[in-house]
């Protein structure tokens, strides 16, 4: 598993993580990535993190996506904070797969619920 984020947001135990220093490194080593939902209120509580610098360094933009391979798949756990973890110009790029994820959300939950109830 690789991680590309501000060093102040990394977990204490990084033993099994590959730490990437740039989007280029991410794209060299990945054909699928999962963005994480950034909670602005949590970042603002961390004095060592400048929110504007975080966005400038880590936001997925159209320019960044243009550097990636054509078959890259970008996933997101939702809800998406457009303008924070992904820019408005990148959200409709075909590499962004949140609409596919949404189409599977309810059926996946139904199956999980039935499984827990031993119905399948």
What are the roles of these predicted feature ranges?
Residues 1-120:
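Structural/interface elements that position substrates and couple domains in central-metabolism enzymes
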């Amino acid at each position: 598993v690789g991680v590309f984020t501000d060093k102040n947001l990394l977990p204490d135990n990084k033993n099994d993580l590959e730490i990437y220093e740039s989007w280029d490194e991410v794209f060299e080593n990945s054909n699928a990535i999962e963005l994480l939902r950034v909670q602005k209120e949590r970042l603002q509580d961390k004095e060592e993190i400048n929110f504007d610098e975080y966005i400038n360094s880590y936001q997925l933009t159209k320019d960044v996506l243009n550097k990636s391979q054509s078959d890259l798949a970008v996933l997101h756990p939702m809800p998406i904070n457009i303008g924070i973890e992904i820019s408005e110009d990148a959200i409709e790029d075909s590499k962004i797969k949140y609409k596919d994820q949404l189409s599977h959300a309810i059926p996946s939950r139904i199956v999980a619920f039935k499984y827990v109830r031993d119905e399948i």
